[in-house]
């Protein structure tokens, strides 16, 4: 079985730092007007002070129940918000980051604002020749707060133009933030946008907005409905547990239907509402779905996938050849879980195909097994596909973010379809347009024996696209299966098994990206094969960031999961490397891992790529191609500049 002996030249393996998150932040309440009445009774010289608290809320606000409690940290909060500054009390000493290192961390082809904080993707859509992307944005700092809707447009989902801010918190019903929302195309092609507002009393309500000028392909100006809010927390739902409306879909009765995430005690739930005009709503007594002990469901998504085709489906499509996906972002764990199941339109309910891997269950399915949260899909009618966006937060300290002046990126948009071979999971793949950034390429065919580390000569290794196939030598597989001393291992975990330094008979093997020449810094992305039940192979796909940087004030987890490998399939992976972000896709996208890494030595020209096989017994053949990647064209829009490069 596995040995902890490592042949890779590495530094001592440290336990990954645990991510910490403050569950509560202080709430600053708006001061209410106070009238002070002073009555002086003549002859007695007694002064009585009467203080009357007068609340001047309008009628619609008075209908909203509020709770006097601390504001809960929601999707928008940075997960590792501690600042490590000394080792005297057991905390990790902060690394002396400098501008040279921090400048290198900024990505070249992932979307991010010019500066400051960004989180959830909002309301993505394709309209009059442009892809629109809205996002949670703080225009004032590199930390969460003052949330508005940023806005950018693209012709191809890769090259972007920043547009003016789309919506700001300028009304009582969104005074504390214009939070996450979704777009819906109506039957006549017009657009409505539902979004969550955090009121001046920190109550979460749903609001309606629409384009001021539908003829404008850039959708520069948005109008908020005069009757907002259109939905308030219903009885039994906490004032701060009611957020993130989905894209609406058409029911068989012709009404529009949306779902909104919430919780009741520790049960995560998805509320259902019907509407005909997006201004008035009918709440269903039943829930679309609920799962006990999963906590608050944020950024719920609900959409159909085809059982037979590899194209995407409009959100309203239903029928016998369709399955439906529910995704919820778990506030407690910061993980995006999904499940596949059957939707009953008449009852407005959904049931999972496999209850043992229901939404939010720890052994259930995830979009991504790394740093990926608050995701949102949309149907791209331009190319007949469903596109997934996901927020990739930082794993460094907030102090480092402030120093570099920005925080967070978005993942490369992915297509999403049902795996028509397994019928049990989704497959995600970077949109085809990313290939337009490929520059020079090199092809390699290598056979690497046990304990081998091989440098891969590709020149600069900061911006790469790698596609690879691996095969384990047949004789080694036969010996492995025939060895009765090797027991089945169905509980192998990338996170707890020692990472890429833990040696087994058939792994780990893969690539070390963002490595320095001496491998003191490296981020291995790899497969590990174990014996499963009934003489089958179990394959796990992992990313080990525990040695990605010499800095200690960084969270450095080991990510991974089992990945289905069907009979006759080779082991395949694709890796996108873009400075401080690594995105890995195994078996055509059945398993995905996104990581944030912060090298201090493996930067600029010192960044290297290695192929490794740290197995004890197996010889592995690797066939792969490595492309250098160009920069994406991402800059502010001007009326004189419409020449955006396009791959379409």
Curated annotation (Swiss-Prot):
Q: Extract one GO molecular function annotation from the record.
A: beta-fructofuranosidase activity
Q: What is the main EC category here? A: hydrolase
Inducing stimuli: Induced by gibberellin (e.g. gibberellic acid GA) that accumulates in seeds after red light treatment. Accumulates rapidly but transiently upon infection with virulent but not with avirulent P.syringae. In whole plants, expression increases after 2 hours of exposure to drought and abscisic acid (ABA), and after 5 hours of exposure to high salinity treatment. At the 5 hour time point, expression under drought and ABA treatment is also higher than that under the high salinity condition.
Q: Where is this region: Disordered?
A: 1-28
Q: Which residues form the active site?
A: 120
User: What disulfide bonds does the UniProt entry report for this chain?
Assistant: 494-542
What topology in the membrane does the UniProt record assign? Answer: Single-pass type II membrane protein
Where does it primarily localize? membrane
Q: Which residues bind substrate?
A: 117-120, 136, 144, 179-180, 243-244, 298, 331
Q: Does the keyword Disulfide bond apply?
A: yes
Cellular compartment(s): Membrane; Vacuole lumen
What would be one Gene Ontology cellular-component term for the protein?
A: vacuolar lumen
Q: Does the keyword Transmembrane apply?
A: yes
- Which residues span the membrane? 36-56
What the entry lists under Pfam families is as follows: Glyco_hydro_32C, Glyco_hydro_32N, INV_N
Q: Which Gene3D superfamilies match?
A: Exo-inulinase, domain 1, Glycosyl hydrolase domain, family 43
Function text: Possible role in the continued mobilization of sucrose to sink organs.
The family classification in the record reads: Belongs to the glycosyl hydrolase 32 family.
Instruction: State the name under which the record lists this protein.
Output: Acid beta-fructofuranosidase 3, vacuolar
The record lists the organism as: Arabidopsis thaliana
**Which gene name does the record give?**
BFRUCT3
């Amino acid at each position: 079985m596995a040995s902890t002996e490592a042949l890779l030249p590495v530094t001592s393996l440290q336990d990954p730092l645990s991510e910490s998150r403050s569950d509560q932040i202080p709430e600053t309440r708006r001061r209410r007007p106070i009238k002070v009445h002073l009555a002086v009774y003549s002859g007695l010289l007694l002064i009585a002070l009467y203080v009357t608290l007068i609340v001047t809320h309008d009628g619609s606000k008075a209908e909203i129940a509020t709770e006097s409690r601390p504001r809960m940290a929601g999707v928008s909060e940075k997960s590792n918000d501690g600042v490590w500054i000394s080792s005297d009390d057991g905390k990790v000493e902060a690394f002396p980051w400098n501008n040279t290192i921090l400048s290198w961390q900024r990505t070249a082809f992932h979307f991010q604002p010019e500066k400051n904080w960004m989180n959830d993707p909002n309301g993505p859509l394709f309209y009059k020749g442009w892809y629109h992307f809205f996002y949670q944005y703080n225009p004032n700092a590199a930390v969460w707060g003052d949330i508005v809707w940023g806005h950018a447009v693209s012709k191809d989902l890769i090259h972007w133009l920043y547009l003016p801010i789309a919506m700001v918190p300028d009304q009582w019903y969104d005074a504390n933030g214009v939070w996450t929302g979704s777009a819906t195309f109506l039957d006549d092609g017009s657009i409505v946008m539902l979004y969550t507002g955090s009121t001046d009393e920190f109550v979460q309500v749903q609001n309606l907005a629409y384009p001021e000028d539908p003829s404008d392909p850039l959708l520069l100006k948005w109008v908020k409905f005069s009757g907002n809010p259109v939905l308030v927390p219903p009885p039994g739902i906490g004032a701060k547990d009611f957020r993130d409306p989905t894209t609406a879909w058409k029911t068989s009765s012709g009404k529009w239907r949306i779902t909104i995430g919430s919780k009741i005690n520790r049960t995560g739930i998805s509320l259902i509402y019907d509407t005909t005009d997006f201004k008035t709503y009918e709440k269903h007594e039943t829930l679309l779905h609920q799962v006990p002990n999963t906590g608050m469901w944020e950024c719920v998504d609900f959409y159909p996938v085809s059982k037979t085709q590899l194209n995407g489906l409009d959100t309203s499509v239903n029928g016998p050849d369709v399955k439906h996906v529910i995704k919820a972002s778990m506030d407690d764990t910061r993980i995006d879980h999904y499940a596949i199941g059957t939707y009953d339109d008449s009852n407005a309910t959904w049931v999972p195909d496999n209850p043992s891997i229901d939404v939010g269950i720890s052994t259930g399915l995830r979009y991504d097994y790394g740093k990926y949260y608050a995701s949102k899909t949309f149907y791209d009618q331009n190319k007949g596909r469903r596109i997934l966006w996901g927020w990739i937060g930082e794993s460094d300290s907030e102090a480092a973010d402030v120093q570099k002046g920005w925080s967070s990126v978005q993942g490369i948009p992915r297509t999403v379809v049902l795996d028509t071979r397994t019928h049990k999971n989704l497959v995600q793949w970077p949109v085809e347009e990313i290939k337009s950034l490929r520059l020079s390429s090199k092809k390699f065919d290598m056979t690497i024996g046990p304990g081998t580390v091989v440098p891969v000569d590709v020149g600069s290794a900061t911006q790469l696209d790698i596609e690879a196939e691996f095969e384990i030598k047949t004789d080694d597989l036969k010996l492995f299966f025939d060895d009765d001393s090797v027991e089945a291992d169905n509980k192998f975990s990338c996170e707890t098994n020692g990472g890429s330094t833990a040696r087994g008979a058939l792994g780990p093997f893969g690539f070390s990206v963002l490595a320095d020449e001496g491998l003191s810094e490296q981020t291995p992305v790899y497969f590990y094969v174990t014996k499963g039940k009934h003489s089958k192979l179990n394959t796990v796909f992992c990313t080990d960031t525990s040695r990605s940087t010499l800095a200690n004030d960084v969270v450095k987890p080991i990510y991974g999961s089992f990945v289905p490998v069907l009979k006759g399939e080779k082991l395949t992976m694709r890796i996108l490397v873009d400075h401080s972000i690594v995105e890995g896709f195994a078996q055509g996208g059945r398993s995905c891992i996104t990581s944030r890494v912060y090298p201090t030595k493996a930067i600029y020209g010192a960044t290297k790529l290695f192929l490794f096989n740290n197995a004890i017994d197996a010889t592995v053949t690797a066939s792969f191609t490595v492309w250098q990647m160009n920069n994406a064209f991402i800059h502010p829009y001007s009326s004189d500049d419409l020449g955006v490069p396009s791959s379409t």
